[in-house]
Design a protein with these regions (language model features):
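Acidic (Asp/Glu-rich) sequence patches and key acidic residues
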Residues: 1-105, 111-112
Length: 112
């Protein structure tokens, strides 16, 4: 166990815009917790997941049953949008894994 405190002298955060998954923290939380271990704050508006595990979740989304996908919270016409199919969600997760900081193995999600 270490006892000496160290403070980051450089901490840079930049967020890219994402138009998908707005107001969908709970669905993403349930999706990630269904198959992997990740970190989320109490209100689920910040989540972190290993990049490789996120890609595994994307693969799992494409393989899961329609019933399971709906149980997680996605369904046809969700938020008046028919795009949220399993293929669409899986491809978005892959895109976010690709777009995340290449120097970090963790993909950070934040809703604000």
């Amino acid at each position: 166990m270490s006892y000496t405190l160290h403070v980051a002298t450089t901490y840079k955060v930049e967020y890219g815009g994402a138009l998908e998954f707005n107001h969908m923290q709970e669905q993403i939380y349930r999706l990630l917790s269904h198959k992997t271990t990740f970190w989320a704050n109490e209100s689920h508006d910040t989540m972190e997941i290993d990049r490789v595990e996120l890609l595994e979740v994307a693969d799992h989304v494409e393989e899961m049953s329609d019933k399971m996908f709906e149980r997680i919270g996605f369904k046809e016409g969700f938020h008046g949008d028919d795009r949220y199919t399993q293929e669409f969600v899986a491809n978005l997760l892959r895109k976010y894994a690709d777009d995340a900081d290449p120097d970090d193995n963790i993909v950070h999600f934040c809703w604000y």
